[in-house]
Amino acid sequence: MALASDKFVLSAIVLAVLTVAAAAAGYGGYGDVGEYCRVGKAVSRNPVPSCRNYIARWCAVAGGRLDSGKQPPRQLLEPCCRELAAVPMQCRCDALSVLVRGVVTEEGDRVAGMISQHAAPGCDAATIAGMASALTDYGRCNLQHTGFFGCPMFGGGMD
């Protein structure tokens, strides 16, 4: 039978662990990074332009199908991977979302994405988004990631 003091000590330890975990998530963790990853802060208005070229070429080579197994030459992927590596890890999906879907900035400026510009003829919006998400897969660019495999979804955007 546990004593009341043992239960109190256990509760205090659990509370301390939860407090430390919450503080770690808020400080440099992967909590709410929305403000940090906005266009004009960690994400530029024209993020990862080499990835735009790579996705457009991938659409052409693959005939508009993500599952075709056909991909552009590796030397076209390498500049894209370098640009993605320069984006903070927790902002990569946001940068790719801006690239694919575009965004309306806080100032009200519209930044068009690949979908609205029809920058990848032959690929529909879902395929373009899938190809962009696949760029964050470890096997593609060998980038460290936040724990997700690819970008689980693109939020917001204009398209």
Curated annotation (Swiss-Prot):
GO terms for cellular component: extracellular region. It holds the Pfam family Tryp_alpha_amyl. Disulfide bonds join C37-C91, C51-C80, C59-C123, C81-C141, C93-C151. Keywords: Allergen, Disulfide bond, Secreted, Seed storage protein, Signal, Storage protein. It is found in: Secreted. Five disulfide bonds are present. Gene3D superfamilies: Plant lipid-transfer and hydrophobic proteins. Its main location: secreted. The keyword Disulfide bond applies. InterPro entries: Allergen/soft/tryp_amyl_inhib, Bifun_inhib/LTP/seed_sf, Bifunc_inhib/LTP/seed_store. The keyword Electron transport does not apply. GO terms for molecular function: IgE binding; nutrient reservoir activity; serine-type endopeptidase inhibitor activity. Belongs to the cereal trypsin/alpha-amylase inhibitor family. Seed storage protein. This is 17kDa alpha-amylase/trypsin inhibitor 2. It comes from Oryza sativa subsp. japonica (Rice).
